[in-house]
Amino acid sequence: MQQVLIDTFIVPEESRAEFLENTRGVQEFLKTLPGFVEGYLYEKKDGANRHNMITTAVWESEEAYENARKAALAEYQRRGFNPQELARRLRVEGERGVYERSPY
């Protein structure tokens, strides 16, 4: 069964450009991994100079997702990239969930 990684973020206006630059870099890497099906970024500006963002990445299977997760962690380490530190510095709030996808 397909696995869907769904991340939700609240991004301050002043952090938006840097956050998107880093997010798009991660997305470009994920697209190269075996088992990647599709991914999207959704964005909605709220009235408080913040942006609500959702990113999704769909994987063929649980195994493909797990392999991608490990590959992403290795790539972060290779680049010296720490997503948690970036989120703290940019004052981005986030939450992650992994869901099974099935048609309805």
Describe the function of each predicted region:
Residues Q3-I10, Y40-A72:
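Short, well-ordered beta-strand segments in beta-rich or mixed alpha/beta enzyme
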Residues S15-R16, Q27-E28, E43-K45:
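Intrinsically disordered, low-complexity segments enriched in polar/charged residues with Gly/Pro
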Residues G25-V37, V58-E95, Y104:
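An amphipathic, aromatic/His-enriched active-site/gating alpha helix that lines ligand/cofactor pockets
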Residues I6-T8, E95-V98:
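Short amphipathic
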Residues I10-E21:
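Short, surface-exposed ligand-recognition loops at beta-strand->loop->(often short) alpha-helix junctions
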Residues E43, V98-E100:
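A general secondary-structure junction signal
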Residues M1-V4, S15:
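Short amphipathic alpha-helical segments, especially helix-boundary/capping motifs
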